[in-house]
Amino acid sequence: MAHRSTLLRSVAAALISATLAAASQAATVLKAPRPVVWQDFLGVNVQFQYFAPDIYQQQMARLDELGLNWVRLTIHWPVIEPQKDKFALSELDAAMEAIKAHHYNTLAYMVGSAPFASSAPPGATGRDQYPPKDFSTFAARMVSLAQRYPQVNNWQVWNEPNIVWLPKEDPAAYGRLLTTTAQALRTALPEKTIVTAGMAYYSQMHSTPGYLLQSLLDGGLGTQNIVAAYHPYSEYPEGDSVPDRDFLVRANAMNNLLHSNGVSQVWATEWGWSSYDGPVEMQRLIGTSGQADYTLRRLALMSALDFQRIFLFNLSDLDERASARDQGYGLLDLQASPKPVYTALKNFLTITGPRLTPTDPPAVSQVPDDLYAVAWSREDGKHLLMVWSASGVSLTFPAINDAIVHDPLTGSRIPLSATKGITLALKPTLQILEWKP
């Protein structure tokens, strides 16, 4: 126990104090730890029941066109039980039937306290953001949902309790909610997978030192066969500070922390960028083109890290019930029409094919300091290099005389040929080089 606590403190320190010097040594020519099958690795967040059936059927059709199968469904307890034992489930029932018809692998999470169950003091605002007075009531409602919707095999307990838990975050209390709910679900439905709440960012807290996921590990998370989840949002695909490459540093440290302490599955259950046009709310304004660019670069990076599954936020834009920023995260607009990010992702998945195997990168000359590259082998034997560099220099590949360079943002496909090795002009956006070894 003492050794584990020392390990936890040392990894937490690495997460907190990733310096420019340390980050500059981080490898940016990456090799994934295992093959990736997009249909199993990449999912999307959805809120089908908050849309008209004709719209969410179109959303599902668009998702099917991408060849993806995993969805993460939001369920707000105050919405489905506005009064004690008075349930409003008709919209959710219909959405769940559509999910069943499409054979989606589904992760559902319930968040927020119903009015009758909230621990909020009288007159408090944001009553749903207070934890329930009785954790067993929350657990019983999740069991009831899991029994009502047997097509859902994965259940997640709350959402972002490191920032959405009034009056302040409480790691011990969330740990009790998780344990109470997991025990109730396993007693009733032992085959279901239990997932921790997706922690905002890397699970750091507003006013409590440390990381909530670390607190759960101290409480035995690694022995409970529970999936760990967090939401690595950042300003840029490479992190909040591009020179520090802090996404790679922090995600690797957190994944290593979790895996080395007994957690077998680590899921990023939200990540992405909004295309909103203001007013500015934490994320800077990047528009629809920036959203497409950032999403592809982050997807390339995440595919090469030790995540077992990731869920992009979000399949669709949201209506005025969400904040201005949160309205714009979708692959699709409110009418289920593709945004540029959807088209770019579809191009990306078409280029890569359904399954990739990690391989060694090709030999190159004069690698720039800001290069990011991930090497893969496609099912047809072709090799792919996902690559970008803000400096926009050129790379020469001495052993490759014929190749194709794909730009998934534009859909362009340009042949390259040279007798002494091709030269590729790098861009700050993702390109994919394809060649036959």
Question: Which residue stretches match the model-derived regions?
Answer:
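Aromatic-lined substrate-binding rim segments of carbohydrate-active enzymes
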Residues: Q57-E65, W70-G126, T137-S144, R148, ...
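Carbohydrate-binding surface patches
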Residues: V364-N401, P408-G411
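Boundary/entry segment of secreted carbohydrate-active catalytic domains
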Residues: A27-L63, L68-N69, T74
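Short, acidic/polar
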Residues: Y50-D64, T137-L145, S207-D218, A292-L299
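Noncatalytic carbohydrate-binding groove/subsite architecture in carbohydrate-active enzymes
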Residues: P171-T295, L305
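Bacterial N-terminal signal peptides
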Residues: S10-A21
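Aromatic/acidic polysaccharide-binding cleft in carbohydrate-active enzymes
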Residues: W273-L345, P361-A363
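C-terminal beta-strand-rich structural cap/linker in extracellular carbohydrate-active enzymes
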Residues: S417-P437
